[in-house]
């Protein structure tokens, strides 16, 4: 009888490939008795559970994925599958957060800050398309970056993108409130007030 977690995993994977899911599941469990921190065993059990779709399969699959993520936080596949399960239940905001947790660490924070600072430089010399490219890149990796949300709002306003400017101003203020970081509030409020003044001017001239 195999007494080695690697060998047990290989046997389990072989059974899984042949479609013998019950035997595969049993061998993954045995591997976990030898090594409770075997993240891939939890991940593979999640895949089996999803494949079989038995009673409460979503709950079981999520539990296995959470075990895997606890051991290997930045294992992309487990996070992607967790996000997919959340989206199936229309929990899109939670799904976005799960994916953000693996996207953010992809690059060093200093690298992202350099892109943000270059975007600010572009914005200040009027190169708005280039600035927007940099700000959107930062948004991809750090969607909660208040300074970047401020620059996105200002850049969109400068380019005449009123809806986008207002959108980023409002979510920026919400994010600032959550983080208790208010150094960009003046910029957010200026964009909102200027758009509000523009809308009143349009109403008066009609």
Specify the residue positions occupied by each region the protein language model found.
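Structural marker of alpha-solenoid helical repeat scaffolds
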Residues: 34, 71, 105-107, 141, ...
């Amino acid at each position: 009888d195999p007494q080695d977690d690697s060998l047990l995993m290989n046997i389990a994977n072989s059974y899984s490939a042949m479609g013998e899911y019950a035997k595969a599941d049993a061998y993954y469990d045995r591997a976990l008795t030898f090594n409770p921190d075997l993240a891939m065993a939890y991940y593979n059990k999640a895949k089996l559970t999803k494949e079989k779709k038995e009673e409460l399969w979503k709950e079981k699959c999520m539990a296995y994925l959470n075990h895997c993520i606890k051991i290997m936080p930045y294992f992309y596949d487990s996070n992607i599958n967790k996000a997919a399960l959340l989206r199936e239940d229309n929990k899109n905001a939670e799904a976005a957060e799960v994916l953000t947790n693996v996207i953010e660490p992809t690059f060093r924070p200093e690298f992202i800050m350099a892109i943000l600072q270059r975007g600010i430089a572009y914005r200040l010399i009027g190169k708005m398309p280039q600035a927007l490219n940099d700000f959107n890149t930062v948004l991809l990796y750090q969607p909660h970056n208040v300074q970047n949300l401020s620059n996105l709002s200002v850049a969109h306003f400068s380019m005449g993108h009123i809806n986008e400017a207002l959108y980023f101003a409002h979510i920026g203020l919400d994010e600032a409130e959550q983080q208790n970081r208010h150094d960009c509030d003046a910029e957010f409020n200026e964009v909102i007030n200027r758009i509000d003044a523009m809308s009143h001017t349009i109403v008066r001239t009609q």
